[in-house]
Amino acid sequence: MLPKLNGFDHIHIDVLNRKKAAEWYKNILGFTIVESLTVWAEDDNGPLTIQDPFGKIHLALFRQRGNFTPLTAIAFNADGREFLKWKDWLKKQNILLRCSDHKVAWSIYFKDLYGNSHEITTYEYDYVSSQLK
């Protein structure tokens, strides 16, 4: 039996200026900056995460650099227990690329057969941290 996914977590979008993009999404779609995740935006390579008014849709705004081809990735969400099951499942399938501690969340990364990037993220940080030690 496959582990359960809760839904999409966030969509990566490359932009030239994260602040200007966040303002545009606010003005056009009502998205606001997710204050609890702004620590990631302190790093030039990290995302500025914004969300819709209901907190259901998250966009991770990444700064596009030079001739870089924009990154497209789908990030799914799972609770802590299911996240660990997915980690084991992907490892068994030999497609788990890495498991990353983001200090407020955990993510696992893998690619499909065509090289498209995928991620599963959980915000049950304390639970997963305790299980991975």
Regions found by a protein language model. Give the residues of each.
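N-terminal beta-strand motif that seeds the catalytic metal site of vicinal oxygen chelate
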Residues: 1-20, 73-74, 128-133
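Residue-level structural signal for beta-strand termini and adjacent loop
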Residues: 39, 64, 121-123
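Core segments of cupin and vicinal oxygen chelate
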Residues: 12-57
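Vicinal oxygen chelate
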Residues: 1-4, 8-16, 48-53, 64-133, ...
